[in-house]
């Protein structure tokens, strides 16, 4: 199954939107792309939002029809993650699992916090840098539970099935064996990355421990079930999420016409980024 992208506007601008297409027709990366690429083999589809070593805070938007990828804003300004020494930008290919939802109406029994109202985040640790809008097939290795401003924010650790090391990685202990330092750096990065913006250090459930593959698969299944309730209109409050889709004919928000309402591609050259985004921040107590 091949997916392509349709870009509108220039990166690093408020006008930028990136729609995902299947067979040339826009689909929702939140709802239309299947979670499983191969359920029997436990291979998942992951939508890449932010390529490794980049700074722009790109995300699947929840409020717009067909959920294009846009750059997040705060007070009308584009958001960029800071460079926290010794890291540059995001340290993984960062993205999300389609057809998952961290329900903000439900408190998780172990984290004691509600879901963050987003699809489940994925940290892809393979050697190849992805691109925004790429649909990767990944195998799950483990999971961390970030507690982000009082909400549970799961971070699944996964690897592209085409990575040379993928055949050797089967569970979370293999990450430390073949990627020594990766889990420690991941924990550090998520703890400190908001500090340069004046926010406190993030906290983790489970004392920052990465849970194993079985635990991760259970969380993915739970959030997939939550998404099913969401897309079928079975939750009392959908929190403003656009549920419009172009393939799920048994859902109340199915709309074949929605694809034709997406503007034609109008890509523009990337807009320049302010030099301040390159600054390195040195965080006391890190590393």
From Swiss-Prot:
One of its GO terms (biological process) is phosphate-containing compound metabolic process. One of its GO terms (molecular function) is magnesium ion binding. Its cofactor is Mg(2+). Its main location: cytoplasm. Mg(2+) 1 binds at residues 116, 121, 153. The keyword Chloroplast does not apply. Signal peptide: none annotated. It comes from the Eukaryota. The lineage of its organism: Eukaryota, Fungi, Dikarya, Ascomycota, Saccharomycotina. Its EC number is 3.6.1.1. This is Inorganic pyrophosphatase. It catalyses: diphosphate + H2O = 2 phosphate + H(+). It is an enzyme of class 3 (hydrolase). Diphosphate binds at residue 79. Belongs to the PPase family. CDD domains: pyrophosphatase. InterPro entries: Pyrophosphatase (IPR008162), Pyrophosphatase_sf (IPR036649). Mg(2+) 2 binds at residue 121. It comes from Zygosaccharomyces bailii. It is found in: Cytoplasm. The keyword Hydrolase applies.
